[in-house]
From Swiss-Prot:
Keywords: ATP-binding, Chaperone, Nucleotide-binding, Phosphoprotein, Stress response. Residues 602-638 are annotated as: Disordered. This is Chaperone protein DnaK. GO terms for molecular function: ATP binding; ATP-dependent protein folding chaperone; unfolded protein binding. It comes from the Bacteria. Residues 605-620 have a biased composition (Polar residues). It comes from Pseudoalteromonas translucida (strain TAC 125). SUPFAM superfamilies: Actin-like ATPase domain, Heat shock protein 70kD (HSP70), C-terminal subdomain, Heat shock protein 70kD (HSP70), peptide-binding domain. The gene is dnaK. Residues 625-638 have a biased composition (Acidic residues).
Length: 638
């Protein structure tokens, strides 16, 4: 078995590590750097450049130089943040035939996993040059808050790069592995604050020593899949462009070459201000007009930078609070804070985190390399080179299906330890229903349309029967990569249908954030909706039951009573279609009152049936050949 390498596939930079002599080692690339810019360029002569060479030529080839591709992976073109990125990216983001967000560069339309694969190929080659052998297996990291589609798309990128992805591991969990492997202090609860180039994650992880086994258990995770260093850069870019327009009266946003230079200068200024109090952005000949060349000269202080990005830093605090609440912990329960991701080098970020937790974050973790190191350790665990390490990660969002009344019924709750498998039995909503549609959802809301649709499939060939009779077993299986597999089985016929949720779309920043925020802010709305659905279902059952009783009563029910009851049934059916709970309840009550005669007929028939049964029993007692039998009453749970 060959070595399993660990790859941190980052938005801004990527990193590769491998277990070497029992220790995880970060590998330097061909340029001698320990991290590689996640930049890909397609040149005029058909060459593909990756990393520093691609970044160096970006100024002269902005429309064919792709960066921050991780922000598009597993996403739909129509997603709000994709639309937002279209306005600021110099390269062209286009809509693929399947609705995904693709990139047009080098005269071709390319999928995000395809472009990401170029970075992974570079990481693979870097490892092969160091090890002197072929590498075919890898552990790749993703943000903890990546959804099913984004994880699938990342695995696809690995496959395109010629790698068998042995495991997808969450970035904060990988960082905790890197930090905790050499710590033998018993129970230790750490908060991993991971603010990278394009994503933000927060995980609460318990590191413990149990009977000689190192356990890393994720207690809760939260985050924002569209918040990172790129957003900080964009604030600086917008400020520089606005200052230049104020000074020169020219809008640089119409000039791709100028914008690429401004982007590089903004990133450089942001980094410099982590150690300096002020810096100057000097870009001679940044553009020109009829009067001649124009130069940019803008002074930027740390205080100004902090005022530009303060709300972005504050935005990261809400997920912290939610993760602590989900883990049922308070700030005082956290022993250590680990900062991961290049953006955490910013003093304002460090200060904000320290103020929230009431203690300074640890300084002994390299924010750029910890994730790749953790991935390499996990690779060692999978290869059997690292013993006595148990990693318990979680599913970041609830997973379920749409049930009667457009309700999201969760089979796997958020923050459930993975891998996990859960089955639940459902039934049909109509008489003689021969097929059911299994609609798979991800999110925290009760109403199915308020959650993210991951996919749907049909289970056909169900034997005709009364509603509520067929037994359909739905099974959700989340593997160690956090990828969902769903199956539905008709217990009667044994027919089964399976689906692995395909990477057809990604969760938008707005969708993911809103799912949990809305679930909290609209708890009252959700409760009212649940009550409305319960009332509707109860009324629907009454309509169905009443119609059946009318049929069974036959001629025993006077025609005038029958007409009155049928009119009440129609009234209730009309009410069920509305959103007025009180009206549905009133019409249900009206039908119950009108159906009094039906009840009397049903009771009379039941009494007659009991009398007949009594006579048969008496007759049976007189028979010498008596057989005792046990019976069990089975009630349908509708």
């Amino acid at each position: 078995m060959g070595r399993i390498i660990g790859i941190d596939l980052g938005t801004t930079n990527s990193c590769v590590a491998v277990l070497d002599g029992g220790k995880a080692r970060v590998i330097e690339n061909a340029e001698g750097d320990r991290t590689t810019p996640s930049v890909i360029a397609y040149t005029q002569d058909g060459e593909t450049l990756v990393g520093q060479p691609a970044k160096r030529q970006a100024v002269t080839n902005p429309t064919n130089t792709v960066f921050a591709i991780k922000r598009l992976i597993g996403r739909r073109f129509e997603d709000e943040e994709v639309q937002r990125d279209i306005g600021i990216m110099p390269f062209k983001i286009v809509k693929a035939d399947n609705g995904d967000a693709w990139v047009e560069a080098g005269g071709e339309k390319r999928a995000a996993p395809q472009i990401s694969a170029e970075i992974l190929k570079k990481m693979k080659k870097t490892a092969e040059d160091f090890l002197g052998e072929a590498v075919t297996e890898a552990v790749i990291t993703v943000p903890a808050y990546f959804n099913d589609s984004q994880r699938q798309a990342t695995k696809d990128a690995g496959r395109i790069a010629g790698l068998e992805v042995k495991r997808i591991i969450n970035e904060p969990t990988a960082a905790a592995l890197a930090y905790g492997m050499d710590k033998n202090r018993g129970e230790n609860i750490v908060a991993v604050y991971d603010l990278g180039g394009g994503t933000f994650d927060l995980s609460i992880i318990e590191i413990d020593e149990v009977e000689g086994e190192h356990t890393f258990e994720v207690l809760a995770t939260n985050g924002d899949t569209h918040l990172g260093g790129e957003d900080f850069d964009n604030r600086v870019i917008n400020y520089l462009v606005a200052e230049f327009k104020k000074d020169q009266g020219l809008d640089l946003k119409t000039d791709p070459l100028a914008m690429q230079r401004v982007k590089e200068a903004a990133e450089k200024a942001k980094i410099e201000l982590s150690s300096a109090q002020s810096t100057e952005v000097n870009l001679p000949y940044v553009t020109a007009d009829a009067t001649g060349p124009k130069h940019m000269n803008v002074k930027l202080t740390r205080a100004k930078l902090e005022s530009l990005v303060e709300d972005l830093v504050t935005k990261s605090i809400e997920p912290l609070k939610r993760a602590l609440a989900d883990a049922d912990l308070s700030v005082s329960d956290i022993n250590d804070i680990i900062l991961v991701g290049g953006q955490t080098r910013m003093p304002l970020v460090q200060k904000t985190v320290a103020e929230f937790f009431g203690k300074e974050p640890r300084k002994d973790v390299n924010p750029d390399e910890a994730v790749a190191v953790g991935a390499a350790i996990q690779g060692g665990v999978l290869a059997g080179d690292v013993k006595d390490v148990l990693l318990l990660d979680v599913s970041p969002l609830s997973l379920g299906i749409e049930t009667m009344g457009s309700v999201m019924t969760a089979l796997i709750e958020k923050n459930t330890t993975i891998p996990t498998k859960k089955s639940q039995t459902f039934s049909t909503a109509e008489d003689n229903q021969s097929a059911v549609t299994i609609h798979v959802l991800q999110g925290e809301r009760k109403r199915s349309s308020d959650n993210k649709s991951l996919g749907q499939f049909n289970l056909e060939g169900i034997r005709p029967a009364q509603r509520g009779t067929p037994q359909i077993e739905v099974t959700f299986d989340v593997d160690a990569d956090g990828i969902l597999h769903v199956s539905a089985k008709d217990k009667d016929t044994g027919k089964e249908q399976k689906i692995t949720i395909q990477a057809s779309s990604g969760l938008s920043d707005e969708e993911v954030e809103q799912m949990i925020r809305d679930a909290e802010a609209h708890a009252e709305d959700d409760k009212k909706f649940e009550e409305l659905v319960a009332t509707r279902n109860q009324a629907d059952a009454m309509v169905h039951g009443t119609r059946k009783q009318i049929e069974e009563a036959g001629d025993a029910l006077p025609s005038e009573d029958k007409e009155a009851i049928e009119a009440a049934v129609v009234d209730l059916e009309t009410a069920i279609k509305s959103d007025k709970k009180d009206e549905i309840e009133a019409k249900t009550q009206a039908l119950a009152e009108k159906s009094q005669k039906l009840m009397e007929i049903a009771q009379a028939k039941a009494q007659q049936g009991s009398a007949d049964a009594g006579e048969q029993q008496q007759s049976a007692k007189q028979d010498d050949d008596v057989v005792d039998a046990e019976f069990e009453e089975v009630k349908d749970d509708k």
